Amino acid sequence: IIMSITNITKADVNISSYETKNGIKVLFSKSDNIPMIDIKITFDAGSNRDGDTKGLSMLTHSLLDEGTSVRKSEEIASIFESNGSIFNTSVNKDRSSISLRSLTQAKYLNPSLKMFLEILSDSSFPNNEVNLQKKRTISTIIEDQSDPSEIASNLFFKEIYGDHPYSHPSIGYADSVKKISRKNIKDFYDKNINAKNASIAIVSSLSKKEVIAIAEKISKSLDKSKKKVITKQTKTISKKEKYIFKNFNSE
């Protein structure tokens, strides 16, 4: 079932490393303190993959749990909440992640994991949810425009990285988010949220055998033949020292 298994021991933490049938690298650390499981899937799908549609990765990830072909956002939220599970997504300039935290008892874990797998394989991005999330995102961007720390951070990255994909804020710009279509989102999901673009980390009180079974289910849900990985963008960045000043009105 598993292509390779190695063990790494450091500071009393034992980490098992192996690959699923379709080649996803999995790291597992056993923790017997609490009967829980933490699953984190990391993708090479940060905002550096946005291309001309700035904010695309973050918008896509924020919509993953807003609907599948058979469930609406309310039902998805209810499944996680009623089983005490937490679903979360995160996007930075380099990477994105999709995670699940659940109790390990079967009556809680099974429905939570089933919902998690459905999101990975079948997010549908309903038009009404896309439009609503775009409005929320634009409101956040507008609010950030009056936040000195956000302004300073955006200026810093723009000055340092120029036209490199790292230069724009991961959330995007109001005008760019406004132009993002459902098709843009679906295409990004299909091209980037896939088995060849993923790695999995799991911390749990479950046995290695049980974790392997879960990893294989995740791997299978991400294995969609039509998905493809985009070649990593690389660009030389010249090192330079600059001081960036921005005046703020105290009124």
Tell me the role of every PLM-derived stretch.
Residues 66, 144-195, 215, 248:
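Scaffold signal of the M16-like zinc-metallopeptidase fold and its non-catalytic homologs
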Residues 77-78, 123-142, 207, 226-240:
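Acidic/histidine-enriched alpha-helical segments
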Residues 136-154, 234-251:
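Short acidic/His-enriched helical or mixed secondary-structure segments at domain edges of catalytic enzymes
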Residues 162, 167-170, 175, 199-251:
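An aromatic/glycine/proline-enriched structural segment found at the starts
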Residues 9-13:
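Boundary at the C-terminal end of the N-terminal hydrophobic targeting segment
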Residues 27-29, 34-59, 73-120, 150-175, ...:
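M16 family metallopeptidases and their MPP-like homologs
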Residues 62, 74, 78, 110-114, ...:
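Solvent-exposed, polar/charged alpha-helical surfaces in well-ordered, non-transmembrane soluble domains
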